[in-house]
A protein has these predicted regions:
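Cytochrome P450
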Residues: 1-420
Length: 420
């Protein structure tokens, strides 16, 4: 972190601080801005931004208060949904995409229950050997002695393989799932990139809808399986979802993004963190039993989803500030996970941190991430297999991050492997 960025963060008038700027996360310069908000204004109002006026909630305690109160704070697309950027305005006849994450109760619970069995503990126990088999296959085929991009060869590859399994999607076309996941948040207000071809984005998302519609139709009349499409078809609340293009595309994209981003960017973030803190890396070499706790700490430290947005359904006092009905409230999970009042030495990755699981990366309350156990399982298995084969996954160049204020994505992690 440059001293210049810290000076800038301390000199800007409090009322003008805008932590939604995508370049803060691309350049990894967000820390001093959130440090200041947590200290001076954990509930902070910005009157004007690219995303309109909004409240920022930056402390761990107040984030949980908002996330846990779904009667006051709405996730519904009717009120603007879950991201600080309002959804793109659909053209005439265009599909917008709506999923259960952008619904309030009871609709949210009804549709969430349809796919929950896919990631239930009993089913995860059944697919654990498959995850391990695929992790081993990936690791055994990595180049040794030369540098390569860990994101492309490991993070993306493992999540693409698991996504194909979860959807029973054609395995040879698995990288389409990753591409469609990236498209889901590729809008200028989220990325800061005004050159995005929104027509091509829409056309490509329609290809995703078409591919999944064909997959849906191919499963009609087939024995029920534990893949996500079969689960949707065999639940009363979602059995006819294919007849509603908005809900169909929205639900598919939610499940793709949910199955991709947390795992993929935590796999990448873990390598970065362990290289930054080599003493912590040594701890898991000495005691691999720390890996499950390390996984929680990586997810805290990386925080794959930077924020979630809610909209106030009524006037509400939060942290001494008066929020009015209809106002946008943004929970900055990334900041909550660096709250020193909860996590001692919060900016450091500490693999045996006793309260690592207190992180808010998966959210809190009824919208808590449904696939959190699957993400943790994949990370645990991968690091168990890494430590059996490699003394070090060494970072050998500069990390490249994506410009995005919603997903804390990583594009390039150049590494070299050092076998045991």
């Amino acid at each position: 972190m440059s001293s210049d960025e810290s000076k800038l963060a301390s000199s800007v008038p409090l009322g003008q601080i805008d932590v939604s700027r995508p370049e803060l996360f691309r350049d990894d310069t967000w820390r001093p801005w959130f440090d200041r908000l947590r200290k001076e204004a954990p509930v902070h109002y910005l009157a004007d931004s690219v995303n309109g006026p909004f409240w920022s909630v930056s402390s761990h305690k107040l984030i949980k208060e908002v996330d846990g109160n779904n009667e006051v704070f709405s996730s519904s697309s009717e009120w603007g949904g879950i991201a600080i950027a309002d959804p793109p305005v659909a053209g005439e006849g265009e599909i917008q995409g709506q999923s259960f994450i952008t619904m309030d109760e009871p609709q949210h619970a009804q549709q969430r229950m349809a796919v929950a069995p896919t990631v239930a503990p009993t089913n995860l126990t059944e697919i654990e050997p498959l995850i391990r088999e695929r992790a081993i296959d990936i690791l055994e085929n990595l180049p040794v002695g030369k540098s390569f991009n860990w994101v492309q060869e490991v993070s993306i590859e493992l999540t693409a393989r698991m996504l194909a399994t979860l959807f029973d999607f054609p395995y040879e076309e698995r990288h389409k799932l990753v591409y469609w996941s990236d498209l889901a948040t590729a809008i200028p207000e989220v990325t800061g990139d005004d050159s995005i071809d929104m027509k091509k984005r829409y056309d490509d998302l329609m290809q995703a809808a078409g591919a999944f519609y064909q997959l849906w139709m191919s499963k009609i009349g087939q024995p029920a399986g534990f893949d996500l499409i079969s689960m949707l078809q065999n639940n009363e609340a979602t059995a006819s979802i294919n007849e509603d293009p908005d809900r169909f595309l929205g639900t598919i994209l939610l499940l793709i993004v949910g199955g991709n981003d947390t795992t993929r960017n935590s796999i990448s973030g873990g390598v970065i963190g362990l290289n930054k803190y080599p003493d912590e890396y040594q701890k898991i070499r000495d005691n691999p039993k720390l890996i499950p706790n390390m996984v929680s700490e990586i997810i805290r430290w990386q925080t794959p989803v930077i924020h979630m947005r809610r909209t106030a359904l009524q006037d509400y006092e939060l942290g001494g500030k008066q929020i009015r009905k209809g106002e946008k409230v943004v929970m900055w999970y990334l900041s909550g996970n660096r709250d020193e009042s909860v996590f001692e030495d919060a900016d450091k990755l500490i693999v045996d941190r006793p309260n690592a699981r207190a992180h808010v990366s998966f959210g809190f309350g009824v919208h808590r991430c449904m696939g959190n156990r699957l993400a943790e399982l994949q990370l645990r298995i991968l690091w168990e297999e890494i430590t059996k084969r490699f003394h070090t996954v060494e970072l050998v160049g500069d990390v490249e991050r994506i410009s995005n204020n919603f997903i804390r994505g990583i594009k390039d992690v150049p590494v070299r492997l050092h076998p045991i």
